[in-house]
Amino acid sequence: MPGNPWPHDMVITVDDDSQAVLDLLWVREAWELEPVGDDLPPRLAHGPARVSETVRADASADPVSWQQAWPGLWQATLAHAARPHDPCVFEALGRTDDGSPERRELLGRLIGPRAREDFGEPAFADPAYLEWTHARFQEHMLRRPLNAEDQPERRSLDALIRAWRAGLEKVVAIPCVGTFTRMLGPHTLLVTGETRRDPARYAEALAWFAESR
C-alpha cells in the first residue's frame, strides 16, 4: 500500500500468550516454588493467588520435584518457542494413526514441552488456576490496540525493521515485571510485556538484537 512504512515482505510473528509459558510461570508462583538456575525470568506482573492447603495436601502433588525440574523445563519451553514453524509436521500428522508412536512424536514436536505432562494435573487442580487464567485473558483483551498504528511493533517500527534485516522473525513476550531481554537463537527475541508496551524500551531491545547479530 502506498505510504505504508511497513516493508511489504516483512513478516514478524508475535507470541505474547503462550500457554506453555504461562503455565510454567503460574506453577512457580502459585506453588511458591523457588527454582535455582541460570537466567530464570522475573516474577509475573500480576501474580496468582497461593494454592490452597487442601490442594497442597493431595498425596499426588510433588512441589519438591517440580521445583527441581522447573529450570530445565523453562529452557526447553523457550527453545521450542524459538523453533521456526515447520508446515511439514502438519502434513505428516495426517498420515499417522491415532495413538501411534509416530503421532506422539510429531505432536511433541508441534506442541513442545508442557508443564501439565511433566507435573501432572495435581499442579493445576486449584480453582486459582482458572481464576488467574480468566483474569489474564481479560487483561490481554483489554490491552489489545484498537487500531494497527497503536500496535507495539508499529510504534517501534524503525527499530523493528533494523532487527528484521538482522534476522528477526519472532518476538516472544512474557507477562513478567521489569526488563528481561534475551535472544532465543538467531531469529527470536524474548522480552517482557512491560518492555514491549513501552516504545522506547522496545526500540532499545530491538536495537540490541540487531547489534548482537
Located regions from the model:
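Generic alpha-helix signal with a bias toward terminal, lower-confidence helices
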Residues: W26, L33-D38, R43, A82, ...
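Auxiliary, metal-adjacent structural segments of Zn-dependent hydrolase domains
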Residues: F124-L189, E194
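Generic hydrophobic, helix-prone segments enriched in Leu/Val/Ile
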Residues: L25-R28, W74, L107, L168-V171, ...
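Active-site recognition of the HExxH zinc-binding catalytic motif
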Residues: V191-R213
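N-terminal low-structure segments adjacent to metalloprotease catalytic domains
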Residues: M1-T133
